[in-house]
Amino acid sequence: MSVVIRLARAGTKKRPFYHVVVADSRFPRDGRFIERLGYFNPLMAKDNEARLKLDLDKVKDWLAKGAQPSDRVARFLDITGVKKREARNNPEKAVPRKERKAAAEAAAKK
């Protein structure tokens, strides 16, 4: 059983509200979950403290048990200081494909 900390969408049409939940990765996004850890309201201002609320003790407990945070939840945990998020860096993506091939061939010849 792979356990994930992720967002479950709630709210109405065009007015999203998300619960931060712990769920089995096989469960539907908005369906069954194991435990609710907090909420996220994207409609509030970014500097508003009530925009994101997490029970940090429960989050740390689930991370210690091996739960994997989703990308968005990992950003939240980085902001709150619970878990450092690894930076995604792919410098080759910005280089045009032809130049990438030429650089790879030049490196292979050396």
Curated annotation (Swiss-Prot):
Checking InterPro entries in the record gives: Ribosomal_bS16 (IPR000307), Ribosomal_bS16_dom_sf (IPR023803)
**SUPFAM superfamilies in UniProt:** Ribosomal protein S16
BP GO terms, sorted: translation
List the residue ranges of the region (Disordered): 87-110
Give the domain of life.
Bacteria
GO cellular component, alphabetical, reads:
cytoplasm; small ribosomal subunit
Sample GO molecular function, one term = structural constituent of ribosome
Record Pfam families: Ribosomal_S16 (PF00886)
What UniProt keywords apply to this chain's record, in alphabetical order?
Ribonucleoprotein, Ribosomal protein
Q: What residue stretch is flagged as signal peptide?
A: none
Which family does the entry's similarity section mention? Belongs to the bacterial ribosomal protein bS16 family.
Q: What is this protein called?
A: Small ribosomal subunit protein bS16
Q: Which organism is it from?
A: Rhodopseudomonas palustris (strain HaA2)
